[in-house]
Swiss-Prot record:
Organism listed in the record: Methanopyrus kandleri (strain AV19 / DSM 6324 / JCM 9639 / NBRC 100938)
Record bears the keyword Transcription regulation: no
Keyword Kinase belongs to the record: yes
Protein family according to the UniProt entry: Belongs to the UMP kinase family.
Name by which UniProt lists this protein: Uridylate kinase
BP-aspect Gene Ontology terms: 'de novo' CTP biosynthetic process; UDP biosynthetic process
Subunit structure: Homohexamer.
Pathway(s) where this gene product acts: Pyrimidine metabolism; CTP biosynthesis via de novo pathway; UDP from UMP (UMPK route): step 1/1
Lineage: Archaea, Methanobacteriati, Methanobacteriota, Methanomada group, Methanopyri
UniProt-annotated binding residues for UMP: G43, D65, T112, H113, P114, G115, H116, T117, T118
Enzyme class of the recorded protein, top EC level: transferase
Function: Catalyzes the reversible phosphorylation of UMP to UDP.
Amino acid sequence: MYSVVALGGSVVNVDKPERIKETAEILRNGLDSGLKICVVVGGGPTARRYINVARNLGTPETLLDEMGIAVTRLNAMLLGAALGLHDLHVPETPVEAARIVRRNGVAVCGGTHPGHTTDAVAAMIAELLEGPLVIVTNVDGVYDKDPSEPGARKLRELRPEELEELAVRAELKAGGSFVVDPLAAKMISRGQIVTHVVSWEDFRSRGLENVVRGRHNGTIIEG
């Protein structure tokens, strides 16, 4: 069974080496259970620091995208090292990532193209592999509005089209934020990708082999 795991930069963070070790162990256990895994790593706080400094220096937005992608690839190399993949080649496109997973059973990558978030890249790879997508984030699932707002309600299940609608609505709202960005939500909806949105704590306690089968406390997105 193929599975794609999107890890936010808050998970693979150079300031939290123990979390990187734990993440690698969870992924190794998933591989040992027979899963074939592609991991897509975000840039997180490190990318934001570089981008903020560069933006203040007047750097064009396209180059800022490239800087962010470079950081995600460094994070991918770091996680690959934690997995013992010392000859790791970081794929540069979703097609290449899918090809490596089919051949080797595992791949670790970061961003690929300017304007494409790592969650969107993960969704593209999941579509190619026809496997479930797991998004590990800093909230415990998808909410009907910003979780910090009073009355916000966690959604246990929803359809891909509903996810896309929520993501677009959050983007249009001033200061709004959503656990899945609009581009990734669009990719999930287009490909009708079974998606599990879980917190890091849930991911750690349940293990990947349980999460991909819906045994978690997060949100399941399925058509």
